Amino acid sequence: MKHILPYWHELPDLDLYLDQVLLYVNQVVNSQESLEQNCLSSMKINSSLGNEADDRTGVHQGKLTTDNVDFRRVLTAAMINNYVKHKQIEKPIKKKYQKHQVARLIALTILKNVFSIQEISQTLNLLLNSSDSESLYNHFVDCMRDKENEKTPDIIRFACQSVKLYYKTRQLTVDLERSQHES
């Protein structure tokens, strides 16, 4: 089954309890195919001098793979409780989380490997001054799928590139360790 980050309209319409949120978010972000598809498989980067950089991003053309590297990110109940306590996500209503909270948790879980939770929350709050959660989340999914367009805010575009570069660096580290153990 091919699993990629869901768009807003694909997120659950029903409000979810904490255990359901944990199951759903972890399932979405932990799928190896999702990570390969969204973070690495079609990312544009190559260090060869012959390639021209994209004018908008400065990133070169190329292809990346994960080679079965385990890049799982885990979201726990304690993390969600801390996010609520520190106002990084809204408090659940009658212990139920709504679609915008689930979308924010997916983004936080993916971005937290590169940026601090405070940086992510501050940036999301600033972006929400000029756009809505649905549009911002869909731009994020587009970027992770390498389908961004001219309406995609640069801050989202560069955040996604940072995540992809982080995973490429992790992949290179694993490959280096593997080659050193084999020699």
Where are the predicted features?
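Intrinsically disordered, low-complexity, charge-dense segments enriched in Lys/Arg
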Residues: 123-183
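Basic helix-turn-helix/winged-helix DNA-binding cores
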Residues: 1-121, 125
